[in-house]
Amino acid sequence: MRVALYPGTFDPITLGHVDIIRRAAALVDKLVIGVAINRDKGPLFTLEERVAMIEAECAALSAETGTEIVAHPFENLLIDCARDVGAQIIVRGLRAVADFEYEFQMVGMNRALDDSVETVFLMADARRQAIASKLVKEIARLGGDVSKFVPPRVNDALKERLGRA
């Protein structure tokens, strides 16, 4: 069974993330969405809320692709999380050259820790390259419309959280 891990903070999940999930799911038998617990980032949504948003989006994707897709919170090293969930592959999305430089370093470190886990990069769809959770939150905080960047449920959650419902 081919198992892949797609890690991120997903605060919140965006249409860019959903696109990568859809495409990654087509490549494996099981896709684990690793929801990082990163206290340094000070997330807008709790871990439970982020997991619930991911699960809501992935239910339809799982049915569409025939791939098992599950959310899995983690707080340890990425490579340890990959081992914990039985993943042979780590999936990363790339939007721009700046993403590549960071990811290149991460691949090197992960390989040094465990060279049996492969990293696969999926380029962001051209329509989604500018989307970043950080920017989505900033636009939403300032009263902008983020409905083009996030799933409808997430848009509603942002409005509610930021008092714009």
Swiss-Prot record:
UniProt protein name: Phosphopantetheine adenylyltransferase
Residues that, per the record, bind substrate: 9, 41, 78, 92
Subunit details: Homohexamer.
EC number(s) on file: 2.7.7.3
Listed NCBIfam families: coaD_prev_kdtB, cyt_tran_rel
Localization annotation: Cytoplasm
The protein's required cofactors: Mg(2+)
Annotated GO CC locations: cytoplasm
Catalytic activity: (R)-4'-phosphopantetheine + ATP + H(+) = 3'-dephospho-CoA + diphosphate
Site (Transition state stabilizer): 17
Pfam families: CTP_transf_like
One Gene Ontology molecular-function label: pantetheine-phosphate adenylyltransferase activity
Signal sequence region: none
Annotated residues for binding of ATP: 9-10, 17, 93-95, 103, 128-134
GO biological process: coenzyme A biosynthetic process
Enzyme class: transferase
Function statement: Reversibly transfers an adenylyl group from ATP to 4'-phosphopantetheine, yielding dephospho-CoA (dPCoA) and pyrophosphate.
